[in-house]
Amino acid sequence: MRGLARAGLLALLVVSLTLTLLTGAEIARQPLLRPVIARTADEITAATDRMMAREATPDRIATRLTALLADQPHNWIALQAVRDVATERGLTLPAPVQTAYDAAWETDSGYIAQAGSCLTCVWDAGTCSLSQALICQAPVSLTPIGDVAGIARAGVAYAAGTEIDEIDLALSIVGLSATALVVVSGGSSTTVKLGAGLAKLARKMNLLSPRLIAMITDSLRAGVNLASLPTVRSTDDLALVVKADALAPLALLSTDLGRMNDALGPTQSLHLLRYIDDGTDARLMANAAEALKSRTLGRIEILGKSRLLRATLRWSDEVYALFAGFAGLIASLSSLIASLAHSFATRTLRRLA
């Protein structure tokens, strides 16, 4: 009877090992089977709702607002986002925090309006801060009208041997080449153009992170023949000096920034750009923005970048199958070892008796 039981355990061990190896081999063989995959919009919303239920406490919100009010100049995009979290959760701010918030808004909005800064913002949003744009209700528009000029300036600079504005050039090329680049980015040409325009405006407002600037520069140097720029007179000429495959990371980045802009609008998207360091950040942030809409800002202020972006991902079903296989393997092996140990102990005791 014990022999039959051990045979059964051994068979279970073999089956568990086989299933585990097959699942692992399938994940390794299929490039589309990844251990971590993107959550759906509903899953992102549910995951962040659970996190906010734990983290967005009255003390946490008051502490975050106090810290933001201590910064100079005030970041009113972030301040209003955290204030909206309190409203969403039906929380009343402590009187000192509410008083400080109202006083800061009164001071900043009055000063900016009286100083004439709003006129500048309305004329060109790129010359003012995001807080000024919010207070002045200035329209933040994205236009590819400067793309041709950006490429022309770079061509003249290269011919003259002077410094090229590589960021402006890279984003101008993406904006003008959007139709060709949608093949490698998977987005629409309009989305690519909007994303490139958003990044250009962010650069003008000094909102791009150093790592993102480095990524854009690397893509330009790998994907564009700078020596041929002075000969570019049309989009057809531009296609001859651009390597679409090498510009794929920049096209993907622009697509995701365009998605974020579609979900949130330019002002809120520009605020989130400070958290984006590479293409992966942009993709996950765009996923969050499409799922959460305007609530994205409040969640990133309370949860932080890392936790918000992690909430957009989950383990794939294949990984759960692999874990289940491992668990079965360990359980079977443990049972087999226990059975063998029991048999050995029984035989030993009988001999000693």
Regions found by a protein language model. Give the residues of each.
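Compositionally biased, low-complexity segments of secreted and virulence-associated proteins
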Residues: 2-5, 103, 112-162, 170-174, ...
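Alpha-helical transmembrane signal-anchor/signal-peptide segments
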Residues: 23-48, 194-198
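Hydrophobic membrane-insertion alpha-helices, especially the h-region
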Residues: 6-24
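Small-residue hotspots
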Residues: 16-18, 79, 332, 339
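Alpha-helical protein-protein interaction scaffolds
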Residues: 34-103
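Short, mixed-charge, low-aromatic patches
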Residues: 18-21, 35-39, 105-111, 177
